[in-house]
Amino acid sequence: MTSATSPIILKWDPKSLEIRTLTVERLLEPLVTQVTTLVNTSNKGPSGKKKGRSKKAHVLAASVEQATQNFLEKGEQIAKESQDLKEELVAAVEDVRKQGETMRIASSEFADDPCSSVKRGTMVRAARALLSAVTRLLILADMADVMRLLSHLKIVEEALEAVKNATNEQDLANRFKEFGKEMVKLNYVAARRQQELKDPHCRDEMAAARGALKKNATMLYTASQAFLRHPDVAATRANRDYVFKQVQEAIAGISSAAQATSPTDEAKGHTGIGELAAALNEFDNKIILDPMTFSEARFRPSLEERLESIISGAALMADSSCTRDDRRERIVAECNAVRQALQDLLSEYMNNTGRKEKGDPLNIAIDKMTKKTRDLRRQLRKAVMDHISDSFLETNVPLLVLIEAAKSGNEKEVKEYAQVFREHANKLVEVANLACSISNNEEGVKLVRMAATQIDSLCPQVINAALTLAARPQSKVAQDNMDVFKDQWEKQVRVLTEAVDDITSVDDFLSVSENHILEDVNKCVIALQEGDVDTLDRTAGAIRGRAARVIHIINAEMENYEAGVYTEKVLEATKLLSETVMPRFAEQVEVAIEALSANVPQPFEENEFIDASRLVYDGVRDIRKAVLMIRTPEELEDDSDFEQEDYDVRSRTSVQTEDDQLIAGQSARAIMAQLPQEEKAKIAEQVEIFHQEKSKLDAEVAKWDDSGNDIIVLAKQMCMIMMEMTDFTRGKGPLKNTSDVINAAKKIAEAGSRMDKLARAVADQCPDSACKQDLLAYLQRIALYCHQLNICSKVKAEVQNLGGELIVSGTGVQSTFTTFYEVDCDVIDGGRASQLSTHLPTCAEGAPIGSGSSDSSMLDSATSLIQAAKNLMNAVVLTVKASYVASTKYQKVYGTAAVNSPVVSWKMKAPEKKPLVKREKPEEFQTRVRRGSQKKHISPVQALSEFKAMDSF
């Protein structure tokens, strides 16, 4: 315990003339101005006018004398009131009086003879001495203020120690009441000191320390009370000791900030922009070199080392558990692209060595290098946003589960959930640090790191509070202690969330949120179809959480813009999502869960749920479109989710060559791209025929609104997958390996099976036997061509690349034919298998397997794949038409009320909306939409003082 008589140690050199507060600066400024003006009188040398006394100089000298007298009076008053610095203040006052008298004499003599350089020099020396003396007096007065603050701190420390030593709850209440009174006084004095501090860092430290003191004082009472009530529970002591330590650190922080001796941000590790962002920035600067001074031996190792360091950081992010597979592949691909761009750039520098100016190829290489690093940044930002979107979703759930377990008194369960809560907290901190690593916002990064540090230290104490409650579930004191720590945790998580949101891009957030909601919508639909209630409930909750985050963040973002057309459009979109779309979605989720959870599953309208889910996705997409309305083309390009396919995604251990050799480890897509030109031409002919069939399907499905019509939805899905498969035969598209082609064929088969089920239901309701037979015949074609597509894709899978040469294994076709009916019996039943097998295409069987030309085998395999896709496309077109015709026959017999049967709903698609008036040019519109300045809260006292200051001029 600190003794009441122990001296207060001031960490401040009294001899220092460093000005640390705005008050000292403000008081000193008029005197400096007056002295400077006096010194500069007749500065330009002797005047041509009649010599005589300068009235202006005498007036200035008098004003300096009066100002000095004012300082003396104030200094004497402060010296009388001060206890700790009385001697120093008295000595400083006497020094000011002495220097003031010297200045009075020197200025008077100079005013009488302003042209005398000797008298002017004497006055300049006297002025300097006077300013030094006055500055020292003001600094000592400032020190006296700090000493008063330190005295308050000492009293608070003693009151804190008294609270810690309380022996019972009544004693604790009395001592805490005294502690609260002293806290109020300290806060007032510290707030005044904070306003006066000149250094922004010290002001921030003072504000942070005051905030920490206020925050922890709330927990101090409940933690101490819990310890006194349940001293046998070890967790209560841990809680109390933690809070006391936090309060002591806050008091020390106020002391350090008041004396401007706070540890720097560098010492705390909170300073600077993100490490990866800084490395990328530095790399972008280093690649701009002078060809005249370029030396490969000097610059190549340096640039390559810097790039590999960046790629190592990117690889860590790519390998993180929350990074999605497609994002991981894109990051790896961008890293390879950046590597290649650097080699190309260095080659161009070597070609331009010794030249005064950079040639066009070199400038192009520099631009390409910059673009590739920008693309890598974008993928890293999106990867981080993936993490943020997943980790900062429903952040209170682990805490609530932990508290519920604690209330039940199940200590074993509490320990299990405590581990989950700890992992959740660690994940928040990890993701926050990831967000910092790629951010250029220095102040924002500092806030995130500070908030993450608080989360890290608070997590164990929340668990201790839960353990206390679990040990004494009936104790109101334990419950109150838990509530206080719960509130503190939730506040700190909100602070961290807002800080992370501030250093991340709204555009990236919307792009990733849109993708994640689409993923979750698909999961919901699958869970609904499979009757998985738990997955449906959990995923629907995630959708609601993501949508709520979108609404909150966008509404907050719009507060930074001046009200206008732009903000109105964005806010309309958020309002529609929050007030119309989400309530409908929640209602449909509730209906679906009730129906699936019943003892006997109840029928419900599945299409209604799918429509409600789709509207959520559409709502988020509309918000994103509205937000991007004022973006520049460059910003839109940087935000684009479109991934260039000008590189091949390889594993990090694969061999890479400068030319287009066929090498082990290449993807099958790359192999297809390297076929001879004549083979490519033949494939192109087949693709052209396929596109003709595709255009027919596009024209057919474009007529219909796909909401409530799963036949149209499935037709679109099958068309998209078939396009990807035909792109694969040309060495393009998202399918990279033969396994991807097989999976795509399986997806088509699954979609075909679902379409078969729907269309058969339509056929069953059709009263016209001719229409019914036509529809069933087309469905047989779909089953047949799905079967063909599966076979062709699997025969294609047997094409291998060995030793740099393409060969086709001899057992591929036979094994595919013999196993197909066992693997894909869901496509066509065994009874129709023998009937359909006679119509199967010759999938590469025209060429002798293993003995003919490998290119010919590849060509046959590719053309068979395209032919099967074309046939399937045609069958889908005919099925869509026949399904509609069958529905119209049903309508004619049973009436118009039954046209939208329970199977599918046939509604004409509404035409696209067109503007009634000509749109303004984007550049003209953009000039009127500008970001508003941040709202500043000005206190009435400050406003009044500024008004008085203006009135005084």
Swiss-Prot record:
- Compositional bias ranges of the Basic residues kind: 928-938
- Return the InterPro entries for the record: Alpha-catenin/vinculin-like_sf, Alpha_catenin, Vinculin/catenin, Vinculin_CS
Can you tell me which family this protein belongs to?
Belongs to the vinculin/alpha-catenin family.
GO MF assignments: actin filament binding; cadherin binding; identical protein binding; structural molecule activity
User: How does the record classify its membrane topology?
Assistant: Peripheral membrane protein
Q: Where in the cell is it found?
A: Cell membrane; Cytoplasm; Cytoplasm, Cytoskeleton; Cell junction, Adherens junction
Q: In which tissues is it expressed?
A: Expressed almost exclusively in the nervous system.
Q: Name one Pfam family in it.
A: Vinculin
Q: What does this protein do?
A: May function as a linker between cadherin adhesion receptors and the cytoskeleton to regulate cell-cell adhesion and differentiation in the nervous system. Required for proper regulation of cortical neuronal migration and neurite growth. It acts as a negative regulator of Arp2/3 complex activity and Arp2/3-mediated actin polymerization. It thereby suppresses excessive actin branching which would impair neurite growth and stability. Regulates morphological plasticity of synapses and cerebellar and hippocampal lamination during development. Functions in the control of startle modulation.
Listed under GO cellular component are: actin cytoskeleton; adherens junction; axon; basolateral plasma membrane; cytoplasm; extrinsic component of postsynaptic membrane; extrinsic component of presynaptic membrane; hippocampal mossy fiber to CA3 synapse
Q: Could you identify this protein by its name?
A: Catenin alpha-2
Disruption phenotype annotation: Mice generally die within 24 hours after birth. They display altered Purkinje cells migration, unstable synaptic junctions, defective ventricular architecture, impaired axon migration, reduced number of neurons in specific nuclei, and disordered laminar formation.
- Cite the entry's keywords alphabetically: Cell adhesion, Cell junction, Cell membrane, Cell projection, Cytoplasm, Cytoskeleton, Developmental protein, Differentiation, Membrane, Nucleus, Phosphoprotein
Q: Which GO terms describe its biological process?
A: axonogenesis; brain morphogenesis; cell-cell adhesion; dendrite morphogenesis; modification of postsynaptic actin cytoskeleton; negative regulation of Arp2/3 complex-mediated actin nucleation; prepulse inhibition; radial glia guided migration of Purkinje cell
Q: Which gene encodes it?
A: Ctnna2
